[in-house]
């Protein structure tokens, strides 16, 4: 029942165009959740990430388990295709990848612009997330789906051509000069 009250307070993330501001911040989302969700759901939410842990353990949530498996497979497919392009070996953990996943990965790897490649991958991620969207809008899984979608939208909005060029130039210059690169989180 708590999920009903939570979901009814959240603005829709469906159909947002790139020019429209995101109607809720991550902080506000977590604040609302902290007042309504139980401890177990809050613990799951606090661990939720777009990047699955290397050795993730399946959770009680079908959405989180599917997301983590799908993202891991996307990253393994990306590593495999990049390695093939460089004629290198890559351990893809004996996985087979879906045709749509491989099409997205190959399209991204062939892009000249890293930013455009990331857009292709993020579109694929959004399509995948929509494919695992829970049917029950007022469930705990829907809260996790909403959180993943919010994080993905916010991540996609952070891309900026000028900042990307500056970061690329910084990396390139550090390689050419042999200096250690400062990693920013």
Question: Model-predicted segments: where are they?
Answer:
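Extended alpha-helical surfaces
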Residues: 1-185
């Amino acid at each position: 029942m708590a999920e009903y009250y939570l979901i009814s307070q959240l603005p829709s993330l469906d159909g947002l165009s790139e020019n429209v501001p995101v109607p809720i911040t991550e902080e506000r989302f977590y604040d609302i959740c902290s007042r309504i969700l139980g401890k177990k759901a809050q613990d799951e939410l606090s661990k939720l990430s777009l990047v699955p842990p290397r050795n993730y353990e399946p959770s009680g949530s079908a959405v989180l388990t599917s997301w983590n498996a799908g993202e891991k497979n996307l990253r393994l497919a990306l590593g495999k295709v990049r390695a093939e392009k460089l004629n290198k070996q890559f351990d893809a953990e004996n996985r087979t990848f879906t045709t749509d996943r491989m099409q997205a990965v190959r399209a991204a790897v062939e892009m000249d612009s890293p930013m455009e490649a990331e857009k292709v991958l993020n579109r694929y991620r959004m399509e995948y997330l929509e494919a695992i969207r829970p049917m029950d809008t007022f469930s705990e899984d829907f809260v996790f789906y909403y959180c993943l979608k919010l994080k993905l939208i916010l991540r996609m909005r952070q891309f900026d051509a000028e900042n990307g060029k500056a970061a690329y130039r910084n990396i390139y210059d550090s390689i050419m000069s042999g200096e250690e690169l400062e990693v920013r989180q």
